[in-house]
Amino acid sequence: MAQGAQRKNFGHNQILRPSAAYTPVDEQEVLQILDRHRGQRIRAVGRLHSWSEAVTGDGVLLDLQRLNDVRLQSDGDQLVATVGAGCQIKRLLKELNREGATLHSLGLITAQTIAGAISTGTHGSGRNSMSHYVVGVRLACYDASTGQAIIEELSAGEPLQAARCSLGSLGIILAVRIRCREQYNVQEHFTESRRLLDVMDAEAPFPLQQFYLLPWRWSYFIQHRREDDRPRSRLARLYRLYWLGTMDYGLILQILFLERVARSRRLIRLAFRRIIPAFLIRNWRVTDRSSSMLVMRHDAFRHIEIELFVRRDQLADALGFTQEVIKIAGGRESALSADNQRRIEELGMQEALAGLHDQYCHHFPICVRRVLPDDTLISMASGAGEDWYALSFISYAKPARRAGFSLFASFMARSMSRLFHARPHWGKVCPLEADELTSLYPRFDAFRTVCNTLDPQGVFQNDWTTALLEADGQVGDFP
């Protein structure tokens, strides 16, 4: 055991002050720790890549990085990997690739642990979230009758649906069983369009695509992607170096200079209108392994992020609203369009909009990814119906200079949740009150029931998840 030294998350916007911290070597030690601290609050952490309060805790902290085994097996006609909770995605991909396999769904960041990734609904584009493919969760919790620490296997029904995206609220995840597939290649190329209709029309031939709305230029750069039976391109390695230098590092270094050193809004707008687009090579078609194509070095530099999920039928309105709000926040406009101004007045948010004026200059491409509906209780894409689209807003401002972004993120979350039923990503900045958040999820009551069954004393909660479980927000409560 180590005394609970203070820790910060990746974004330096959350601070953890545990009373005690452990790095157990196996499942048996986890059970021993639970028995030793019976009645105290206990939370697990991964690599702390969450910006939300899901990572916080002032009780006992478990870092499960040593529980990182990977075993790939056939289960009928499917491949299923059993993965230790603390295994990072990058290690998992490497181990699976040795067996000629990979994950169905990948997020941009591979530094996350598997337990952390599924607990917050991590996703890529064009498929379901990672949580959707989970077929079993091995969980340490307490026996309700004896009070002893035990291991539960969740493999069916609502307990499994809850465990697929749990916010760490059911117990301590020890291992995850997740469906895999044979390794495959992805072909990718970029185009640019001024029309969202062109972007959406390209989804049929390129179902794995994601796209970026460039602020201040207001055009869409489309990263067309699809599975490809052809072998890896001869220039794939050169393309990876180009991507690393241009996007993973080059773009962000430009933005860091403009935002943190020059602090010039005029130069930021100029960069997005003229300079950054010049570095994006259009129509260079390259085929490479999926686990290389579908990820980025998104964690190379410290940043903060909010991501909002809207249904397909709300996407066009949501993007139009986004563009107008960014112009107001950046001081380029003083009012929304008549329709959107009326909407804000009906919500009673005129003061919030006025307070945002000229407070924040957005300085990163808005990434939009399509996520298919999930078989979970509370992932952001849970529920049948139309596909979801995740709009990501990132700021590279220094932690001490994030007040403008905080105003922007709060306004966007509050307004878009009411106007477009947008759901904030559980693992990113999540500024809504508990009642508002739970009202966005029709099956939150079922999730609450599973939590209360597996953790009746609430020992695996922090203040934030406790507030969520105690909230009485019902679907439709908020306009």
Swiss-Prot record:
* PROSITE patterns, sorted: FAD_PCMH
The source's domain of life comes to: Archaea
Membrane-spanning residues where?
241-258
Q: Where in the cell is it found?
A: Cell membrane
Q: Where does FAD bind?
A: 113, 116, 120-123, 173, 369, 425
List the Pfam families.
Answer: ALO, FAD_binding_4
Q: How does activity depend on pH?
A: Optimum pH is 8-9. Shows almost no activity at pH 5.
Pros-8alpha-FAD histidine modification sites are 49
Q: How does it sit in the membrane?
A: Single-pass membrane protein
A biological process term (GO) from this entry: fatty acid metabolic process
Xref: InterPro entries: ALO_C (IPR007173), FAD-bd_PCMH (IPR016166), FAD-bd_PCMH-like_sf (IPR036318), FAD-bd_PCMH_sub1 (IPR016167), FAD-bd_PCMH_sub2 (IPR016169), FAD_lactone_oxidase-like (IPR010031), Oxid_FAD_bind_N (IPR006094), Vanillyl_alc_oxidase_C-sub2 (IPR016171)
Query: Which segments constitute the FAD-binding PCMH-type domain?
Result: 14-183
Q: Name one GO molecular function term.
A: FAD binding
* Record text on cofactor binding: Binds 1 FAD covalently per subunit.
Q: In which pathway does it act?
A: Lipid metabolism; fatty acid metabolism
Q: What keywords are annotated for this sequence in UniProt?
A: Cell membrane, FAD, Flavoprotein, Membrane, Oxidoreductase, Transmembrane, Transmembrane helix
Query: Which positions form S-S bridges?
Result: none
EC main class here is oxidoreductase
Needed co-factor(s): FAD
Q: What is its EC number?
A: 1.1.3.20
Q: Which family does it belong to?
A: Belongs to the oxygen-dependent FAD-linked oxidoreductase family.
Name of the protein:
Long-chain alcohol oxidase
